[in-house]
């Protein structure tokens, strides 16, 4: 694959960024994220309409994450010789199909099939996002392009739940998914118009995805990714009970805190390209260290609302560096195998999200209110130490 990348770079060196293609990828990612989290705000009417409990309806989110984890691992093995342009179009079609299947679902089984289609698109698209980006812009512009994509993710995360809730009351949950299907159609046409041909890996150069873990620093990097995202979900999944019981926020106050977090995350993502240009490794070690300190501050002085609000803003600003930073690490240190590295990264993140939320919940129920914070802070500190000691970084 390294020879293939080198040959393509020599023959088709990118001198000007293709921003239209980058924004089409960003829009598609945003649509995927919005649709992934729509059931969170529409769970009650979906459950009532289908005659199931809200807990069962919630599995529509779980199945998407589960399928996405496996799709991210095996998608690049399946499509290696296929033009990536057609693969991305297929993912946009799957996004649209998923929305339509959910919209017309008259049973829980059909609902799960629709959400599984979304998982295929989500896992596959995320696995390819870093490698797609580095083939659309010159190397020096990759961090900026990645910040555009993750900026779209931040916006999607901020608007998904309130938008779904508002539209659900206005037009009904099925029409919300019909509207999402219309966004999927727009994705298809924008990608067809803007995304150039991106040849896949020749079949004679196929390599086992997991052999990448034998490279110096790669296993350490994946462990660091796991710990940082597990630390994030150990805390953020339970921000509502922590903030309402520790700091005494009401529902309205918590809403403002979450909005502040979302805005800070968007700002952090927007600024990430400037920080990563200076030092990717410093950002990947420094960000979790700041988060570890923030968790400690919240544990000790979180009963003060101004402290709790400040920590939420700092957390949003700082954590935004981590996903962009690790994607930049892949495009620089594993440029010859960016798709396969992206596959492992997405699977690790999905597993980390699940483990972090599960262990954080156990700690909250069995140890105490601040235990998710202590768990998160410990994982973030270990991440900072591991990155400093073991993660290798190539210069751009």
Curated annotation (Swiss-Prot):
Its function, per the record, reads: Involved in the efflux of purine ribonucleosides, such as inosine and guanosine.
- Keywords in UniProt for this one? Antiport, Cell inner membrane, Cell membrane, Membrane, Transmembrane, Transmembrane helix, Transport
Q: Which CDD domains match?
A: MFS_NepI_like
- Residues on the membrane's Periplasmic side span 43-54, 107, 169-175, 237-255, 303-305, 365-366
Name the family the entry cites: Belongs to the major facilitator superfamily. DHA1 family. NepI (TC 2.A.1.2.26) subfamily.
Check the record and name the Pfam families matching this protein. Answer: MFS_1 (PF07690)
Identification of the protein by name: Purine ribonucleoside efflux pump NepI
Species annotation: Escherichia coli O6:H1 (strain CFT073 / ATCC 700928 / UPEC)
**Gene from which the chain derives:** nepI
Q: Cross-referenced Gene3D superfamilies, in alphabetical order?
A: MFS general substrate transporter like domains
Which terms does the record give in the GO molecular function aspect? antiporter activity; purine nucleoside transmembrane transporter activity
Q: Which GO terms describe its cellular component?
A: plasma membrane
Topology with respect to the bilayer: Multi-pass membrane protein
PROSITE patterns xref list: MFS (PS50850)
Q: Which reaction does it catalyse?
A: inosine(in) + H(+)(out) = inosine(out) + H(+)(in); guanosine(in) + H(+)(out) = guanosine(out) + H(+)(in)
Keyword Ion transport attached = no
The record's subcellular locations are: Cell inner membrane
Q: Which residues cross the membrane?
A: 22-42, 55-75, 86-106, 108-128, 148-168, 176-196, 216-236, 256-276, 282-302, 306-326, 344-364, 367-387
Q: Which sequence ranges are listed under topological domain Cytoplasmic?
A: 1-21, 76-85, 129-147, 197-215, 277-281, 327-343, 388-396
């Amino acid at each position: 694959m390294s020879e293939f990348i080198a040959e393509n770079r020599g023959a088709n060196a990118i001198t000007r960024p293709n921003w239209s293609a980058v924004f089409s990828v960003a829009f598609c990612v945003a649509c995927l994220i919005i649709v992934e989290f729509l059931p969170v705000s529409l769970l009650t009417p979906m459950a009532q309409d289908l005659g199931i409990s809200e807990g069962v309806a919630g599995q529509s989110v779980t199945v998407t994450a589960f399928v996405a984890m496996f799709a991210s691992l095996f998608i690049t093995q399946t499509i290696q010789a296929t033009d990536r342009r057609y693969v991305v179009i297929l993912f946009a079609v799957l996004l649209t199909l998923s929305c339509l299947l959910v919209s017309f679902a008259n049973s829980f089984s059909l609902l799960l099939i629709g959400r599984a289609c979304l998982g295929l698109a989500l896992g596959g698209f995320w696995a390819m996002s870093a490698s797609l980006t580095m083939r659309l812009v010159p190397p020096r512009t990759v961090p900026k392009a990645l910040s555009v994509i993750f900026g779209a993710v931040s916006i999607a995360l901020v608007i998904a739940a309130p938008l779904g809730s508002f539209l659900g009351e206005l037009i009904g949950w099925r029409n919300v998914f019909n509207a999402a299907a219309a966004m999927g159609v727009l994705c298809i046409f924008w990608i067809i118009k803007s995304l150039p041909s991106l040849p896949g890996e020749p079949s004679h150069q196929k390599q086992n995805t997991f052999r990448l873990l034998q490279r110096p620093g790669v296993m350490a990097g994946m462990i660091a990714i796991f710990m940082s995202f597990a630390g994030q979900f150990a805390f953020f999944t339970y921000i509502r009970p922590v903030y309402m019981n520790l700091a005494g926020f009401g529902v309205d106050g918590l809403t403002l805190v979450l909005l502040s977090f979302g805005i800070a995350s968007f700002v952090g993502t927007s600024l990430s390209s400037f920080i990563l240009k200076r030092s990717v490794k410093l950002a990947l070690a420094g960000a979790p260290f700041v988060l570890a300190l923030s968790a400690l501050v919240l544990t000790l002085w979180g009963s003060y609302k101004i402290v709790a609000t400040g920590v939420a803003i700092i957390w949003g600003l700082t954590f935004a560096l981590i996903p962009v930073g690790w994607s930049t690490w892949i495009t620089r240190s594993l440029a010859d195998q960016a798709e396969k590295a992206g596959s492992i990264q997405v699977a690790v993140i999905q597993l980390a999200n699940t483990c972090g939320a599960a262990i954080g919940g156990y700690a909250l129920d069995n140890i105490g209110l601040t235990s998710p914070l202590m768990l998160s802070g410990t994982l973030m500190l270990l991440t900072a130490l591991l990155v400093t000691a073991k993660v290798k970084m190539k210069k751009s």
